[in-house]
Amino acid sequence: MFYTVFSTNDNPYMQWQSDLLEYSWKQVGQEGELVRLVATDDPENLPSQKHARCFATQSWDVYPETGDAYPIYNKPASLLEWVFREQPEGTVLLLDPDCVFREPVTRRVAPGFPAAQAWAGFPIGEPSMQNPFGIGAGFSFLTEHCAKVDLGIRPVMIPKLIHTRDLKRICGRWLELTGIVRDRFRDPAGNQIWEADMYAYIAACAEYDLQHDPVSLGACTNWDPLEAPDAPIIHYCQPIVGKDGATLFSKHRYEPWHLIDTSIEPEHEFGADLISIINDYVYERAGTVRPLSDQDRPKRAEGIMEGRVLDEMLLERPQDGASLWMNSSGIAIWELCDGSLNVGEIGTKLSEEFDLTEEELAPDILAAIHRLREIGFLSLSG
């Protein structure tokens, strides 16, 4: 079994992110189950989702031993409760709520062989008593609490692919070490760090000798795209900026469900993809689809099966049986929708093939793409 799992509280800020993640999960046809872990003191009144199954867990907003308020304690705590109460078996794709899919994730992992997004720019060093696990001298206090501090570990982060059996091994220790890092580590300004759970995860995995295969799985929105080339997931932890340097989108300031201005081109492709996903969802909630522009790049959804009968083609999505017959002109349009061409460029290519003007072809192109988007066979990026 394959599970996509993310941990949340029950509040409006987490709700819109959960809805957007769920929408993108459905749009790409991600295999398996989508599970939203909800840390709550009111398990009888869980939030509502269209496709995700909500699972109530005990709230760990505050660490009981220290009184430290840090809602991210809920991540290891909720996972720990889920794996032992439900006893799932299989691969878990572990996400944060501020993630969206632009492609499905097809990789699976076996027990003892997790994979995760490489933590770009992490300055891993030589492990020693003064530099436990190589994660930095500022964590030397871990030698008082951890075993095997002389072992090196590959620095990874969300998204992660990990087997449920490995989660059972590490989640308790991950939670405990998160509390220790929050209690002991201070940055140069004397502050606790927000990323405490990320360092604690690395340390817990090192103790269990659980090395991750570092892969391109999720692009953070403040990274150079080369840090996570062709990543199927966008992690919008940081703002999207335009080529002029202006902020186009920030999760902290976004008001759902407003359209995002597309008049300024985002600096990177993943920014354009994220804005397209958000705007597509805004239109879907309103019962329509986003109008096409010449700069939109249609891309075929994964897993669509093709069957030819004479000069026609049947497209079918096995998961739900959705299907569509395409004639010869529709087939020509479909075959060009690989994400590399925008609508205008598709018109140019078809004009050359059919000896018609782009203006003559435009109605058929727009109608075909509109219908394919309606049934989820195509997605758009800017």
What are these regions (language model features)?
Residues 16-19, 23, 73-77, 195-203:
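A structural signal for well-ordered alpha-helical segments within the folded catalytic domains
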Residues 292-318:
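Long, low-complexity, charged/polar intrinsically disordered regions in eukaryotic proteins
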Residues 73-125:
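GT-A fold catalytic core of metal-dependent nucleotide-sugar glycosyltransferases
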Residues 144-238:
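Catalytic core and acceptor-binding pocket of nucleotide-sugar-dependent glycosyltransferases
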Residues 212-291:
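C-terminal catalytic/acceptor-binding lobe
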Residues 14, 44-47, 64, 100-104, ...:
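Short catalytic/ligand-binding loop motif for oxyanion handling, primarily in non-cytosolic enzymes
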Residues 309, 319-382:
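Long, charge-rich, low-complexity alpha-helical segments
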Residues 1-71, 82-89:
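N-terminal anchoring/stem segment of glycosyltransferases
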